[in-house]
Amino acid sequence: MATFPVVDLSLVNGEERAATLEKINDACENWGFFELVNHGMSTELLDTVEKMTKDHYKKTMEQRFKEMVAAKGLDDVQSEIHDLDWESTFFLRHLPSSNISEIPDLEEEYRKTMKEFAVELEKLAEKLLDLLCENLGLEKGYLKKVFYGSKGPNFGTKVSNYPPCPKPDLIKGLRAHSDAGGIILLFQDDKVSGLQLLKDGEWVDVPPMHHSIVINLGDQIEVITNGKYKSVMHRVIAQSDGTRMSIASFYNPGNDSFISPAPAVLEKKTEDAPTYPKFVFDDYMKLYSGLKFQAKEPRFEAMKAKESTPVATA
């Protein structure tokens, strides 16, 4: 099995730019995931985010999670659970408008830190989109422009903790799925593992690394690149000891963004290669919400069928 791709992003600014871009390209084509080091985000900021997130979980969410587990009898399950994930989460929205001030139980300093964290992640996401454009032969800013729609991108952060699980063989931390959106930036626990991706029919661990940011591609990147780059199935395995922190930020198209394979990519496709569908992002999300934990291919086929269905006129 090939080694999980780790990219030193600082090298794009020097003599190793071409080799670094090729490493990113190979990861996007063959893994759908890669891990960034020297990505330019402050390690002090990352340390603060981690400490505050873990403190917040202990103070306000751990007891609630224990009560939920007791109420559902999850300590004593005897057969595999298919409709529930062993995770404690809350969601922060940054763009097009922020909801950070509305989330209850967050200390003011934590709100401020997460706002700063989001600003830095947004910059990193847009830098990565431009590197993808360069690799794909698209004009600089193409992906950002597609994602903007009329009101800007959707950008938000899912803050998760995966507590120790008494039955990790029967309950997943997070069931297998591919992500619906654009580009996902994950700041994860560097001590407690659990994230896995599906590669060549086998589940592969995503290695926890101190101060790294794990990148994975969503379904929209697969569509825009007409399958050259892939979104891949991934999951979180619950652990019997240790609480795993996961802070995943999703830089997604705006609701009214029109998604379709990029013309410059289609020009290079072989004649027998299928063409991916065209659709409005919000329509895809409505479909995805009910089919998240299923294969992506039927979602693409459903959007293609919708695209070819004639609109009735009076």
UniProtKB/Swiss-Prot annotation:
Looking at the record, the residues that make up the Fe2OG dioxygenase domain are 153-253
Induction context: By ethylene and wounding.
MF terms per GO, please? 1-aminocyclopropane-1-carboxylate oxidase activity; L-ascorbic acid binding; metal ion binding
Q: Name one Pfam family in it.
A: DIOX_N
**Which pathway does this polypeptide act in?**
Alkene biosynthesis; ethylene biosynthesis via S-adenosyl-L-methionine; ethylene from S-adenosyl-L-methionine: step 2/2
Listed under catalytic activity are: 1-aminocyclopropane-1-carboxylate + L-ascorbate + O2 = ethene + L-dehydroascorbate + hydrogen cyanide + CO2 + 2 H2O
Q: Specify the superkingdom.
A: Eukaryota
PROSITE patterns for this protein: FE2OG_OXY
* Record: residues binding Fe cation: 177, 179, 234
Q: Name the GO terms of the biological process aspect.
A: ethylene biosynthetic process; fruit ripening
Matches recorded under InterPro entries: DIOX_N, IPNS-like_FE2OG_OXY, IPNS-like_sf, Oxoglu/Fe-dep_dioxygenase_dom, Plant_2OG-oxidoreductases
- Entry keyword set: Ethylene biosynthesis, Fruit ripening, Iron, Metal-binding, Oxidoreductase, Vitamin C
- In the Enzyme Commission scheme, what number(s) does this protein have? 1.14.17.4
Cofactor needs: Fe cation
What enzyme class is recorded for this protein? oxidoreductase
Q: Quote the subunit structure annotation.
A: Monomer.
The record's family statement is:
Belongs to the iron/ascorbate-dependent oxidoreductase family.
Q: Which PANTHER family match?
A: OXOGLUTARATE/IRON-DEPENDENT DIOXYGENASE
Can you name this protein? 1-aminocyclopropane-1-carboxylate oxidase 1
- Specify the species: Malus domestica
Give the source lineage, highest ranks first: Eukaryota, Viridiplantae, Streptophyta, Embryophyta, Tracheophyta
